[in-house]
């Protein structure tokens, strides 16, 4: 019985381990294929949706501030309660956007069992911009150069073959 195996090159895989607040490795990680053709599009979509979500939250807060406030039946006034609900909705949308980029349950991995808190999104944003984005090399010129380097010879040979005909 002959068994053959193949293995793809993993040199373009960025794997980021996750540690607890105490610095203990959780065994969880985020993984990015730096040659994924859709990665630049997902990163761009993350930035666009993040901007859209923040604008929507800002508009909601402005509308709430313009309304007359009414004393609530509980601890908060009606406007305060509506602001908390708007922020909660914003957080849920942002988690969806971040998971679209980080991968399934990416936010949960980063939170390490903690619940989403007031500063969690800011922490995740810093992780993406300072620790992940610099590795992505998402500029179109870099992508074009990689394609030319990888397929340039084949393209040149095809041009020469076509000229001979």
Locations of regions flagged by a protein language model:
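Intrinsically disordered, low-complexity acidic Ser/Thr-rich regulatory segments
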Residues: 72-93
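Extended, low-complexity, charge-balanced
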Residues: 7-17, 21, 84-88, 95-105
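Long, compositionally biased intrinsically disordered regulatory segments in eukaryotic proteins
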Residues: 3-4, 32-36, 65, 75, ...
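C-terminal charged interaction modules
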Residues: 92-165
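Structured domain cores in non-transmembrane regions
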Residues: 53-78
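Short linear sequence motifs
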Residues: 25, 36, 83, 91-94, ...
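Short, charged/polar N-terminal "headpieces" of proteins
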Residues: 1-62, 149, 153-158, 164-165
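Generic alpha-helical secondary structure signal
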Residues: 41, 81, 85, 105, ...
């Amino acid at each position: 019985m002959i068994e053959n195996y193949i293995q793809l090159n993993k040199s373009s895989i960025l794997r980021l381990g996750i540690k607890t607040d105490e610095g203990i490795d959780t065994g969880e990680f985020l993984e990015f294929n730096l040659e994924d053709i859709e990665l630049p599009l997902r990163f761009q979509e993350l930035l666009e949706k993040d901007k859209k979500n923040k604008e929507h939250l800002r508009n909601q807060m402005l509308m709430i501030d313009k309304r007359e406030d009414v004393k609530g039946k509980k601890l908060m006034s009606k406007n305060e309660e509506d602001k908390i609900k708007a922020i909660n909705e914003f957080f849920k949308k942002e988690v969806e956007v971040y998971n679209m980029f980080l991968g399934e349950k990416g936010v949960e991995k980063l939170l390490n069992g903690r619940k989403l808190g007031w500063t969690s999104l800011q922490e995740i944003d810093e992780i993406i911009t300072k620790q992940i984005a610099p590795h992505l090399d998402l500029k179109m010129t870099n992508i074009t150069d990689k394609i030319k380097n990888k397929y340039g010879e084949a393209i040149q040979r095809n041009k020469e073959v076509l000229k001979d005909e």
